Amino acid sequence: MATPLQIGGMVNLEERSGSFLPELPYTNRGVIRQKEELSALIDWCQITIKEVPLEAVIEEVLRIPLELMTVTGYEKGIAGHEVVAIFDNIKVLKPTGNAQYQGFQILMSGKGCRNYENFLQLNEETWFDFLNRVCQYHINFPRIDLAIDDRKPYLSVPDLIIRTKEGLLSSKLREIDFHDSGELKEEVFQSKGGSLYLGSSASNLRLVFYEKGYEQNKKYGTELDENWNRYELRFRQEMAVSVVQELLRYRDVAGLAMEVLNSKIRFLEKPTDSMTTRKRLYPTYQAWAELMKDIGKVKLTMQPQKKSLQKVWEWLEKYVAPSLKL
């Protein structure tokens, strides 16, 4: 079987360190830093695929060379599934116990999505190409997340939390949670990583607003980026399926995000007229209105990780280079 990894054009592997890799503007975490104030990512992709053998899931659906995937002796996975193959954070799981069915589950967390974008780029594909291919099979989408990175930022997450506490939020999502860590400086509380959750963790839609720069600083000790917020739209089950269908039909991430946000929530200003008591008559919070206006410019981007790309090059050198005349 020919390798499913198709490299765009002829790449000289011996020259890669002086040409291809340095051209990608990676940060110290192996992530391409976007210059746009607003950008969108697929940040979680979970797919159930039935009646397809493991080798075909890896080589034909994912289009990852089988030699790159580590086939495990069954490791613990999630929700009644065990990991049977893995490449960094790209996982293929098999159902166990009550979850039995003939097939597998592809699981890519945020890091897994960044890992997989290396293969998309090397195959000269986009997420739309991948999702379209996946939908040719007997599949379901337990979950897919869209993330909007705001590097302006348009919003202050601590301010959103305060507005929510003060009732200045109109929301169709009933369950609300928030976390706001920080410190006192001269008796004034300063946020150091706020998060706002709208919708339950088990619902078909959950919206999460948080300070991504603080999260990355705490997790990895990276340089603090105070101007990096992330707004996540987490879709499950029927809504996840509908989202994928909409993405493939219109290829418009911005329009989809705007439609979901506008239909579910609106942050408010206190009305100047004290007689106004109905929230639907409250004016929209100006910063929220500006975000909704500019979110229409958002495009789906890719931020492949250098770490996993290096593993791909090592595989190419071992398995492909001997058969090429370079």
Short names for language-model regions:
Residues 1-308, 315-326:
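Structured, helix-rich domain cores that form ligand/interaction pockets
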